[in-house]
Amino acid sequence: MIRPARAFFPLLLLPVLLTGCDADKNGGTAADSADLEAAARGWGVAPELVYVTKVSGYTVFQQSVGEYEDEFAAVYRSEKGATTFGLFVSRGKLTAESCSKQPLGEVSDTAVTCEHDGDAWYRKAGHSHEYAVPDGGVVIRLTADADKVDRAILRKAAEAVHRPDDTELAALLRTTDGVDT
């Protein structure tokens, strides 16, 4: 009888081992909730609004991270600093019916065009364009000047958007020595 008990023991561990699987589709684990809540409180936003993205050649500009008009906001800049795109997260929904009715950033007097692209919406108005990604009651917007950042960069940013892990959360926080990374 001891032999079947030994065979059964590893099966008992299986749920424990699988608990951490797929915690973050980008390979890390979600940031500790207490750390995320403290950071969000410091920025003046709700923790569920904090998202990050990853695009080769771009890094987050730490001084830009925080609250902007009740949204979470962060600016990503190119390694050379010549181009930027913004990541904005707010509560709400974006549907085929509402897409063109919602203004695109500061552009309110120009018609917004919408194109469904995978799980996101590609939106354009004047010289601004963005990818808007609905995700469980929030909308993540990746916005840039269409003349400076091409659509492919914004699409990559939209595809990579996710909740931060501990390392990514630390990268959002301003360093204490006054130097950003």
Language-model region placement:
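Bacterial N-terminal signal peptides that target proteins for export
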Residues: 1-9
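Short, solvent-exposed recognition patches
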Residues: 28-128
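C-terminal motif of bacterial Sec signal peptides marking the signal peptidase cleavage site
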Residues: 17-20
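A short, solvent-exposed beta-edge/loop patch
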Residues: 109-181
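Classic N-terminal secretory signal peptides
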Residues: 10-14
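Short, conserved catalytic or interaction motifs in soluble domains
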Residues: 23
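Residue-level marker of positions within ordered structural domains that often coincide
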Residues: 1, 26, 63, 166
